[in-house]
Amino acid sequence: MMSTDHCPAPLLRIQPQFSHYAQRARLAQRESLFYEALELSMAPMLDGNAAAACREWYKSSGRVNAIHGAFIDVNPASGDPAFRELSRRRCRESCTLAVELGAEQVVFHSSAFPFLRGGYLENWADLCAAFYMELAEEYRGLTLCIENSQDLDPEPLEALMKRTGDGVRVCLDIGHAHYSGTPLEAWFDVLGPSIACLHLSDNMGRFDDHLPIGDGGIDWAMADRLYQGLGKELPMTLEVGGLQGVDKSLAFLRRNGYFALEG
């Protein structure tokens, strides 16, 4: 049963771009925002010296609360040993980076193929759970948050959560849930106790548009009720494009008092 207690205002995060770091830093200071660093987990930042200045900026900011781990083509449960090994190396590198930058959470995408269940799903959940729990033990103090990405329903993440402990939780992406075809209530009902953070963006129900909050088809009043029903404060990341998207999203949330944000 969901709680009816009112949650306090959450810790809000954005995903800055180092190429516009000064603007992002001013926005973060003005709005008391933290960072979920994304770009360090994407090429060309994954290798070589290209990331040095970027890493130093994030480290010196004192605002990194989370890292979005490597996710492009990453599948730590791949049936191909070479792909599996590289995926796991990238995940471990993301955790090392998180420790370096002072993050508390690392977000990884769920890698389950959405149209296969049965033995495939059981094997995927077994392999991922063993690996993620190994990482959680190795990087104590970090919470690994597995995000619904191409998932059509909560079943893969539910299977994974049954095999893991407190160090491995769920990042519920509201936008991804919206275009999945499964009602948002089901995502909260099934995964609620395991949710450790939220990703917020809007879309029209077909693609991952990353629209400003309020510009798409998501029922944000319902999303707010479901969040409040969890009875716990969760960090939230605004994945809404550039500065204007963040400003517009914050104004919408505050105007409506959603997620305990006040104008």
Give the residues covered by each predicted segment.
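Alpha-helix-loop-beta-strand connector modules within alpha/beta enzyme cores
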Residues: 55-72, 126-139, 220-226
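Acidic-and-aromatic substrate-binding clefts and catalytic sites of carbohydrate-active enzymes
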Residues: 15-25, 39-52, 75-77, 114-118, ...
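Active-site acidic/histidine proton-transfer and metal-coordination neighborhood
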Residues: 77-169
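Histidine-acidic metal/acid-base catalytic patches
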Residues: 2-7, 23-26, 104, 154-171, ...
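Hydrophobic faces of well-ordered beta-strands that scaffold small-molecule active sites
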Residues: 8-16, 35-37, 65-69, 106-108, ...
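N-terminal pre-domain/capping segments
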Residues: 1-93, 261-263
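A structural motif
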Residues: 32, 98, 103, 141, ...
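Charged helix-capping and loop-helix junction motifs
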Residues: 49-54, 83-91, 121-129, 182-189, ...
